[in-house]
């Protein structure tokens, strides 16, 4: 299956909810500290459906699709200093001034 296909996110089963930007279809989500034990600098792309992620995105870049846990609060997210970049799924993430 071509994971770079232009499709909207599928919502995974379980207590997680996939939230996408309204202006773009996105295939992968990112686990934020509220759902994963990783620090904000170690976020990894996680595919929304059953195929490998299309690319390995280095941080601090994050895709426009976030995987958030709807059953738990998100403490401290307002204090995180994140810079996001909108980009096609399959192009390498090249942040400027991060």
Curated annotation (Swiss-Prot):
Q: Cite the repeat ranges for sequence.
A: 3-7, 47-51, 89-93
Keyword Ribosomal protein assigned = no
Q: Which UniProt keywords apply?
A: Keratin, Repeat
What tissues has this protein been observed in?
Localized to the upper cortex of the hair shaft.
Region 3 X 5 AA repeats of C-C-X(3): start-end pairs? 3-59
Provide any one GO MF term from the record. structural molecule activity
Q: Name one GO cellular component term.
A: cytosol
Q: One Pfam family name from the record? A: Keratin_matx
Question: Does Repeat show up as a keyword for this record?
Answer: yes
Q: Which family, according to the similarity comment?
A: Belongs to the KRTAP type 3 family.
What does the function comment of this entry state? In the hair cortex, hair keratin intermediate filaments are embedded in an interfilamentous matrix, consisting of hair keratin-associated proteins (KRTAP), which are essential for the formation of a rigid and resistant hair shaft through their extensive disulfide bond cross-linking with abundant cysteine residues of hair keratins. The matrix proteins include the high-sulfur and high-glycine-tyrosine keratins.
Subunit-level organization = Interacts with hair keratins.
Protein name in the entry: Keratin-associated protein 3-3
Q: What is the organism field in this record? A: Homo sapiens (Human)
Q: Per UniProt, what is the name of the gene that codes for the protein in this document? A: KRTAP3-3
């Amino acid at each position: 299956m071509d994971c770079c296909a232009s499709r909207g996110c599928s919502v995974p089963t379980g207590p997680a909810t996939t939230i996408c930007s309204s202006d773009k279809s996105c295939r992968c989500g990112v686990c934020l500290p509220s759902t994963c034990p990783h620090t904000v600098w170690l976020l990894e792309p996680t595919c929304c459906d059953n195929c490998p992620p299309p690319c390995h995105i280095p941080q601090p870049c994050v895709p426009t699709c976030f995987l958030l846990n709807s059953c738990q609060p998100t403490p401290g997210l307002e204090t995180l200093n994140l810079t996001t970049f909108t980009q096609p799924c399959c192009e390498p993430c090249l942040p400027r001034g991060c």
